[in-house]
Amino acid sequence: MTQVTVKELALVVDTPVERLLQQMREAGLSHTSAEQVVTDNEKQALLAHLKGSHGVKLEEPRKITLQRKTTTTLRVAGSKTISVEVRKKKTYVKRSPDELEAEKQRELEEQRAAEEAAVRQKAGEEARRRAAEQEAQRQAEAAAAAAVAAKEPESALGVAPEPVAAPPASEERKREEPRRVDKEKVRNVDDERRERKNAQHRPSIKDKAPAARAVVRSVDEDGEGFGRRGGRGGKSKLKKRNQHGFQNPTGPVVREVTIGETITVAELAQQMSVKAAEVIKFMFKMGTPVTINQVLDQETAQLLAEELGHKVKLVSENALEEQLAESLKFEGEAEARAPVVTVMGHVDHGKTSLLDYIRRTKVATGEAGGITQHIGAYHVETDRGMITFLDTPGHAAFTAMRARGAKATDIVILVVAADDGVMPQTEEAIQHAKAAGVPIVVAVNKIDKPEADPDRVKNDLAARDVIPEEWGGDTQFVHVSAKAGTGIDELLEAVLLQAEVLELKATPSAPGRGVVIESRLDKGRGPVATVLVQNGTLRQGDVVLAGVNFGRVRAMLDENGQPLKEAGPSIPVEILGLDSTPDAGDELTVVTDEKKAREVALFRQGKFREVKLARQHSAKLENIFETMGQDEKKTLNIVLKADVRGSLEALQGALSELGNEEVQVRVVGGGVGGITESDANLALASNAVLFGFNVRADAGARKIVEQEGLDLRYYNVIYDIIEDVKKALSGMLGSEVRENILGVAEVRDVFRSPKFGAIAGCMVLEGNVHRNRPIRVLRDDVVIFEGELESLRRFKDDVSEVRAGMECGIGVKSYNDVKVGDKIEVYEKVQVARSL
C-alpha cells in the first residue's frame, strides 16, 4: 500500500496545502504539517467529512451480512488428516422506518381532521349568528320605514310612497366581509387536506431519483432554481443546484463602444461582448483579413462597430498631452523679438554665399560639392538689430527640410539668380512660403553678371503670383550680388522693415519653447540637437521634451561653439542631454517635472508605433490585389548612416523614389552617427549595401566588412549617392534583346536549283544582306515566313555580304514558296543594357 504525504495529496486533488490541512483538522484528523503521511483510512474519513459538509447524506446500510469461518481437522484411517472449513453466514435486516412514519402520519391526520372540524363548526356558528343579526337589523329598518310612510299626508292623496333607499355600498361590503372570510378559511382547509393526500401517494425518493436526474428545468420554469422534491413523508423540499441559468435576450443588445486612435481586434470584440472570431469573420466578409492582435485604425474600427449595430464613441487619447499643455503657463510681459529669416531658392543660386557676406564668413567653400546639405542656423547682429538666419538646401531631395524651414520662420528671403531665372526648387519654395503664410522678400542675386536679366525674373515670379511692389503687389524685390556685396544693406533694411510690420513679440520670462531645426549624433557628446527658441528662455539644466525624446539640458552652445547659460527668443542653439536624436521639426518644450516628461515621451512612442503599424497594414492590404499574380520585384537593400537627421530623411526620401515596376530600393536600416558593428551585422544579415554619408565606419565595422566582403561606400555629396544607386538598379534590370534590321532585298525573279531548291534573284534595296543571319519573308508587308538565309551568291560566287543597289541570289533554308515581289528582310538580335 503506497503512502502519500499531505503535500502530495494536495497536488493530486488540486488544492492548496493550507486549505487541505484545515479541512483535515475539521474532519478530526491530527495532521499539522505538509510532510505527514496520510493513510487510506484517513483519506476515507476526510472524504466522508467533505461529503457531509457539502450536503451529501451518506445512506446507512439497511442490511448487514456477517460471515464466519471455522476450520477443524478430522483424522481418518491411515493416519491422514482432513481440514474441514465450516462457513456460517448471518444477515441482520434493519427494521424499516416506514411503518413508524405511517403511524405518525395517521396520528397527525386525525389531529388535523379534529382541528378542521372544530374550525368548521366555529365558522358555521359565527356565520349563523351574523346572519341572525343582519336579519333583525333589516326587519327593524323596514318597520321604521313603514311608520314614517304612515305619517306622511301624501299617502292619503294617493301619492306613491318613496322607495326605501338601499343601504350604502360600504355597509354592503361590511356585511359581505364575514362570509368571504369564512369561505377563504374553508378553501384553505380543503387545500391543505388535498396536499397531504397527494403527498401520501407520491413515489419515494429512491423511485423518483432517476427521473429527477433526467429532467432539467431552467431558472425561468420554476423561479427557484433547479431541484427536485424529496424528504421524509413526501414533504415538499426544494434542493437548489449550483448551476447558472441564462435567458436569451429578446433583441440585439446595443452597447457603446469607445474607440481611440487605434484599437486591437481583441479589445474591440471585448467591448462589443462578442467573440474575437466573430469580428475576424466579419472582417473577412468585408474583404480585410485580420488577426486577433491586429491593430485597427479608428475609421476601420468605427465602421466595423457600426455595421454590427453598436454605438461608437470616438475619444482622443491625448489626455497626457492636454494635461501637459495646461501645465505650461506663458505669463509675463511680451517684448519685441528678432525676426527669424529663412533663405530659400534653387540650388547654386547663391543662398549660402549671400549669408556668407552678411556674416563675413566662408561657409560655402566648406560645404561638400559647394551645395548646402544641412539647415544652418545663425544669428547676426546688424546696425539696425539682430536677425536670425536659417539656410536651407536647394536640392530636390531636401523638400521636407525646406518645408520645416518655412514653418519655423517669420520671413522668407527667396534667392533667384538673375542669369538663371525661376527654377523648380524656386517654385517649391514659393509654395512652402505661401502654405506657411510667411511674407516673401525676393533677392535677385548675381546681378553683376553680364547675362543677368532681372526683368525676366520679375515676369516669371509675377506669373507665379509673386507681384513686385512697383507693380502694385506686396513683395519687395532687392537686387544683390553676394560676391561684390551690392545691395546687401538694402536687403537687410527690407527684412527689418517687414519685421516691424509683423510686430513680432515674445515673453522672455516664460519657460522656453522652440522647434528642432536639426539633430545629429556626436561620438563624444551624444545626441546633439539644433534648436531655435521661439518663445520664453531656454536655460542650462532645464528638463525638455522634444517629440518622443526627453532629457535635461547639460550644455548649450551657439553656432560658433561657444557655451551659453541661457538662450532667449529667436536664438538658435545646440543642446546636449537628450536621450536620443529627435526628428527635425519636432516641437521642444520645457517641462517642470522629469517624471512627467518621461511619461509623455513613452506615451508618444507607443502611440507613434501603433499608428505606424496600422498604416503599414492598411497599405499592405491595399496593394495585396494589385501585386497578386505579378513577379516579385528585385530589391536593393541599403543600410544608410548620415551625419545629421535632416540629411538622413532627405536621402531616404530620394532613394525610395528610385526604381520602377521591376526594381526598388529598400532602406532596411538608417540612423545618425558613424557606422557601427551592429550596422555591419544588419547589412550582412539582410544582404545590403552600407552607405555612409559624411560618416565613417569604426574598427569593429571595418573588420566585419573585410571578413565578409561587404560593400561599403562613403559619400559626401547627395548627387553621387543617387547616381550610384541608379546605376546599381540599372544593373539589376538586366539586358533586353533588340532587333536591328541589317538590310532589305526585293525578289525580282525565281530560279530553280537542284541543290538549294527555289533561288530568289533579288535587288538589295536598303542596308546590307549577310549570309547565315535570320530573315523574314514579307508578302504585301505581311510576314509569311521566318527562317535563316542559307545561300548568298553574286555571279555564281558565294559571298558573305551584298551591299545596297546590287543584285544577288538568295537561298532560304527549308522554304521554296518564294514569289516575285516578295521582300526578304535580314536582321540580327542584340542584347542592350537597360537603364532607369
Curated annotation (Swiss-Prot):
Keywords: Cytoplasm, GTP-binding, Initiation factor, Nucleotide-binding, Protein biosynthesis. GTP binds at residues 345-352, 391-395, 445-448. SUPFAM superfamilies: Initiation factor IF2/eIF5b, domain 3, P-loop containing nucleoside triphosphate hydrolases, Putative DNA-binding domain, Translation proteins. Residues 229-243 have a biased composition (Basic residues). PROSITE patterns: G_TR_2, IF2. Residues 336-505 form the tr-type G domain. CDD domains: IF2_eIF5B, IF2_mtIF2_II, mtIF2_IVc. Residues 345-352 are annotated as: G1. Residues 114-138, 170-210 have a biased composition (Basic and acidic residues). Residues 445-448 are annotated as: G4. Residues 391-394 are annotated as: G3. Residues 481-483 are annotated as: G5. Residues 139-150, 159-169 have a biased composition (Low complexity). GO terms for cellular component: cytosol. GO terms for molecular function: GTP binding; GTPase activity; guanosine tetraphosphate binding; translation initiation factor activity. Residues 114-252 are annotated as: Disordered. InterPro entries: DNA-bd_dom_put_sf, EF-G-like_DII, EFTu-like_2, IF2_assoc_dom_bac, IF2_II, IF2_N, P-loop_NTPase, Small_GTP-bd. It is found in: Cytoplasm. Belongs to the TRAFAC class translation factor GTPase superfamily. Classic translation factor GTPase family. IF-2 subfamily. One of the essential components for the initiation of protein synthesis. Protects formylmethionyl-tRNA from spontaneous hydrolysis and promotes its binding to the 30S ribosomal subunits. Also involved in the hydrolysis of GTP during the formation of the 70S ribosomal complex. This is Translation initiation factor IF-2. It comes from Azotobacter vinelandii (strain DJ / ATCC BAA-1303). The lineage of its organism: Bacteria, Pseudomonadati, Pseudomonadota, Gammaproteobacteria, Pseudomonadales. The gene is infB.
